[in-house]
Amino acid sequence: HYQRIDSVTAERPKAGDPVEVQEIFSYGCIHCYSFDPELSRWQQRQTEGVAFSRLPAVFSPEWDLLARIFYTAEVLGVGAQLHEPLFEAIHVQRLNVGDETVLARLFEDEAGVKEDDFRAAYEAFSVRSRVLKARGKVRTYGVTGVPTMIVNGKYRVSGRTAGSNVAMLEVVDFLVAKEAQ
């Protein structure tokens, strides 16, 4: 149902810290889009003992664009606000998010981000370096598909190992309880 991450370079939280749960995802992944409402309900049930975050999947340079969009939104402080609209832009509206003008318009329409601010963040060194760091983390965690959940940097759970994406959250709950002890 889950796999232990053997890498010695995986980040491990200290005793007493909240249990860290990361979703490895991609805005381009239809399974991630379909899973997102269930994950949102799961997040709402969590206590202060769980620290949830997202990590965009970067398996190769072709995946950089969507990770760059994610980190641009994060740097601008509109990540949560744009999360669902980005999924919908890609999977429902079928917008070409590779077109910076289309992307700038989306950021402005959905989050009030001015085009100049969007472009400055999108081109920022900090955004590009976060994409590279994400690529390294995905490799360290041994992720080969999305969505995948990482618990405390120690355990990897995917829909494949758990049996389904919904079952993946049940396994995550088990691992969170195990790590909280």
Question: Which residues are covered by each model-predicted region?
Answer:
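Extracytoplasmic thiol/disulfide redox context detector
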Residues: 1-61, 135, 140, 177-181
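Solvent-exposed, acidic/flexible segments
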Residues: 17-18, 22, 28-36, 59-66, ...
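Extracytoplasmic/secreted envelope proteins and their assembly/folding machinery
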Residues: 36-43, 66-70, 83, 100, ...
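C-terminal cap of thioredoxin/glutaredoxin-like
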Residues: 109-181
